Amino acid sequence: PTVALGNRILVGQLPPDSGASADAIVVLGRGKDLRKSRAEVAAKLWKTGRAPKIFVSGREDSPVIMKLLTAGGIPQQYLNSENCSQTTEENARFTAILLQPKRIQRILLITDPAHMLRALLTFQRMGFTVIPYLSPLPLEYTAPKEAVLVFREYMGLANYSLAGRLSRQEKGP
């Protein structure tokens, strides 16, 4: 019950999905257990025309998610990635460096429910207009695993807030 409440509080701060289109879908890595779900959500959004491109961010995860997207029928020319980032802040900064020069501003951001609030605020800080889109946790995810994610996000939000990583920047990375 405590984990569910903690997660509901994090998700309750998010704007609902408006169904609007975006310039790109941005998929954040977050470990091997969450790759398949994120790839499936990104492929679904792309196939329904929500955005013309998919960008994957994350050192360990992006190569695997890119393969899953290709295997799921997304042509390579609509895919791009960076595999240097190791934190949410680096995800946002490196994504901004690569996408904003291409005039990509409005993004559909894909991550898990617990991570979304910090990711949304961090990407907004880098100048993106963000449409949050949640990827579900795998069914086999246990309550203790989910509790770790939720606790980690509360600590991450506190850390980013105290370090000034959630306040608006002037523009870009």
Please tell me what each predicted stretch does:
Residues 1-152, 161:
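A structural signal for short, hydrophobic/glycine-enriched beta-strand patches
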Residues 158:
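Acidic, metal-coordinating catalytic segment for phosphate/diphosphate chemistry
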Residues 166-173:
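The feature marks non-catalytic terminal segments
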